[in-house]
A protein has these predicted regions:
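Flexible "cap/lid" loop of the alpha/beta hydrolase fold
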Residues: 107-156, 179-182
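Bacterial N-terminal signal peptides
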Residues: 8-17
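Active-site nucleophile elbow and catalytic-triad environment of alpha/beta-hydrolase enzymes
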Residues: 173-193, 203
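Short beta-strand/loop motif that positions the catalytic acidic residue
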Residues: 199-201
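Conserved HGGG/HGGXW glycine-rich cap/lid loop of the alpha/beta-hydrolase fold
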Residues: 27-69
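Conserved acidic catalytic loop of the alpha/beta-hydrolase fold
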Residues: 71-87
């Protein structure tokens, strides 16, 4: 009899403890995984990383090789694999192509697109841009050894045109060029069809036309806001970008 009571007590204790652990896990802040775009690198998120870490978030900034969409998705997947709980993926520009596919991982609870590509299944950057208004970006691109760089003038005039000369020089020096083939890499099934999605349109964007951004945001049925910013909004408007990320991370609509 005493043995039976002990077992019942032990089981009840374990049930309570397990429930408490589950509740604790559910209440934990998601890990924020940043995915940069072409002509940037993981350091472009420095402002947001520092602010989020100060608020108790775990943060990972992916370093994409931009050799192919598959390579970048694999790089992002390795970052997701490091995380035990929920993940919010934040993609800028080309990074949107990456999170659209990597976001299918079950750990990913939400997606944040910042002036980013949001392809449908089978779409490439070239395809989704084909019928959109064009910018002057192409005249500032510099091919070299099978990769595409952006010129110093391009950084100043269309990519990071709202930043100080010192910041622009840093952006130019730290850029990650893209393999010339990535613009035709096709996306797989998009995660935005299944996951809560946020989109920030850069109203002053001279790299991706704002109307194309609006089209993609509407197609995703994303919660959308517009920011009077150039393409690299995480550098030109760090506080506003941080606010959107925190909104996504604290949303009650995150995928469980």
């Amino acid at each position: 009899m005493k043995t039976s009571k002990f077992i019942v007590t032990l089981l009840l204790t374990l049930m309570v403890a397990t429930g408490a652990m589950a509740q604790s896990t559910d209440n934990e802040k998601p890990t924020i995984v940043f995915v940069h775009g072409i002509w940037a690198d993981g350091s472009c998120w420095t402002n947001q990383i520092a602010a989020l870490q100060a608020k108790g978030y775990h943060v990972i900034s992916v370093q994409n090789p931009i050799t192919s969409l598959a390579d970048d998705v694999a790089t992002t997947q390795r970052a997701i694999d490091l995380v035990k709980g929920k993940v919010i993926l934040v993609g800028h520009s080309w990074g949107g192509m990456v999170i659209t596919q990597a976001g299918n991982d079950p750990k990913v609870a939400g997606l944040v697109y910042l002036a980013a590509y949001g392809p449908d299944s089978g779409e490439s950057v070239s395809a989704v841009s084909a019928n959109a208004p064009q910018t002057e970006l192409s005249k500032y691109l510099v091919p070299s050894g099978g990769y595409v760089f952006i010129s110093e003038e391009g950084v100043k005039n269309v990519f990071a045109n709202e930043l100080s000369p010192k910041q622009q020089a840093l952006v130019y020096a730290t850029q990650t060029p893209a393999s010339h083939t990535v613009f035709d890499d096709k996306s797989g099934e998009p995660a935005w069809k299944q996951k809560p999605t946020w989109y920030v349109v850069a109203k002053n964007d001279k790299t991706i036309h704002p109307d194309l951004e609006r089209f993609m945001a509407k197609r995703m049925n994303a919660k959308t806001m517009e920011l009077a910013s150039c393409h690299v909004m995480m550098l030109s408007h760090p506080a506003e970008v941080l606010k959107v990320i925190e909104e996504a991370a604290s949303s009650k609509n995150l995928k469980r």
